[in-house]
Design a protein with these regions (language model features):
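Glycine-rich anion-binding loops and their surrounding alpha/beta cores
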Residues: 1-120
C-alpha cells in the first residue's frame, strides 16, 4: 500500500504484467509503519476495529487484499485485472460495511475454539 505492486497474471497460455496502484481504486497509499501489527492480542484488536467500521490504512489494506483475492476467485477473466480488482473492492467494502465479514470471523473464531477444546 506504500507504493505500486507488480502483478503477473497467467491465463489462456499467456503471461501478462500489470502495475496495481491503490490510488486507482480510491485507496490512499500508506507508509509501512501504518500497517504494522503486533502480537495476537493487538492483531485481534485491529481486526475487530476494522470489522466494526474503523477506517484507516489497516482497513484499506484488508479491502485491497480481499479485492485481489475476489478478483482471482470470481474468474471474470474477460475483464482486465484493474476492472476485476475494482469489482472486488466494491464487494470487499460491502462485506465489511454490512457486517458480513465480522459475522464470518465470529463463526471462524467459534469453530476454532471448538476444535481446540480437548475432547474426552
Amino acid at each position: 500500500m506504500a507504493t505500486t505492486t507488480s502483478v503477473l497474471t497467467i491465463g489462456n497460455g499467456e503471461i501478462s504484467s500489470d502495475l496495481i496502484d491503490p490510488l486507482d481504486f480510491s485507496i490512499a497509499r500508506a507508509p509501512i509503519s501504518a500497517l504494522v501489527g503486533g502480537d495476537g492480542t493487538e492483531n485481534a484488536r485491529i481486526t475487530t476495529a476494522i470489522f466494526a467500521g474503523e477506517s484507516g490504512a489497516p482497513r484499506d489494506a484488508v479491502v485491497l487484499n480481499a479485492a485481489a483475492a475476489i478478483a482471482a476467485y470470481d474468474g471474470e477473466f474477460e475483464l482486465n485485472l484493474h476492472d476485476r480488482i475494482a469489482k472486488g473492492v466494491e464487494k470487499a467494502i460491502s462485506a465489511v460495511d454490512s457486517g458480513a465479514a465480522r459475522e464470518l470471523l465470529a463463526q471462524w473464531v467459534e469453530l476454532s475454539q471448538q476444535l481446540s477444546t480437548p475432547r474426552v
